Amino acid sequence: MVKTIENRILITIGAITFVESPDIQRLAADRDEVIFETLPRGRTRETIVRPNGVQVVTVRNRFGDIIQRSRILPDGREVILSYAQEYDREDYVEWRDPSFDLPPMRLTIPVREYTLDARYVENDGDYYDFLELPPVERIEKVYSIQDVKRSARVRDKARRVEMGNITFGFGSADIAEDQIPTLEGLAQALSRLIEQNPGETFLIEGHTDAVGLDGANLALSDRRAESVAVALTDVFGIPAENLATQGYGERFLKVKTQSKEPLNRRVVFRRITPLIAPVASAQ
């Protein structure tokens, strides 16, 4: 089942509803032009050309799923950000949760080594030290962006940074101006990692509390993730294509309550490069 809410699409697969939103507006905010091409088998290619000569190229299948996203540098070099070969198959029909093929998650490290709470970070360098750590499980295959966004089991292979120092007003996706500086330490870590590997991708997860309708909360959480991504790009210069966003509504509450709870209105960061990039996965 598919329906729209607040310029976003709600897709129900089985018993779970996901929110999807086009990221072209965020990626193309600073561009000279955007070129759309139709390819064989219903595929499309979207090329964003920036004033500095950089091109961001996204190829999608007939369902809109991302097959490949690359950054083409002015000298012609290509940086692969993600590549999902299975989405390019002619017999591909619908998404299947890869968690069906995985055993239950067993965390074999202390929780403090799996989750970093930004509220207790004393040294900004801790963000870098944490994000450069490998996934907590072996990566069996190269996953797609959609796999990581939609499957909690796949996503949980990557450690997470809980940005508890950024909260949102009830029903709001706006970041308070006095909270923007709290992103600086994280932004420095992202910049450093991207400088070392321009193909890095970081997922920003948006969340809400449990008050309100599920669909509205999915859309709201997606806008929260997008707001943080825009701030990282506009204020700290993090390339938009190195950031992916996804809203999860009230599905993953930090505080188990059905009441209004600021700690549940939050964002979470994960470095998902090893899950979606062929070279990183091989390593």
Q: Which stretches of residues belong to each language-model region?
A:
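Envelope-exposed proteins and targeting segments
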Residues: 44, 53, 157-164, 171, ...
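Generic beta-strand hydrophobic packing signal
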Residues: 57, 69, 202, 241-243
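Periplasmic OmpA-like peptidoglycan-binding domain that tethers envelope proteins to the cell wall
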Residues: 178-180, 205-283
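Periplasmic peptidoglycan-binding/anchoring modules of Gram-negative envelope and division proteins
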Residues: 143-153, 161, 168-205, 229-234, ...
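Short coil/turn segments at secondary-structure junctions
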Residues: 166-174, 211-216
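Solvent-exposed coil/turn segments that connect beta secondary-structure elements
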Residues: 14-16, 51-53, 60-64, 72-74, ...
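Short polar/acidic secondary-structure junctions
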Residues: 49, 195, 259-260
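Low-complexity segments
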Residues: 1-165
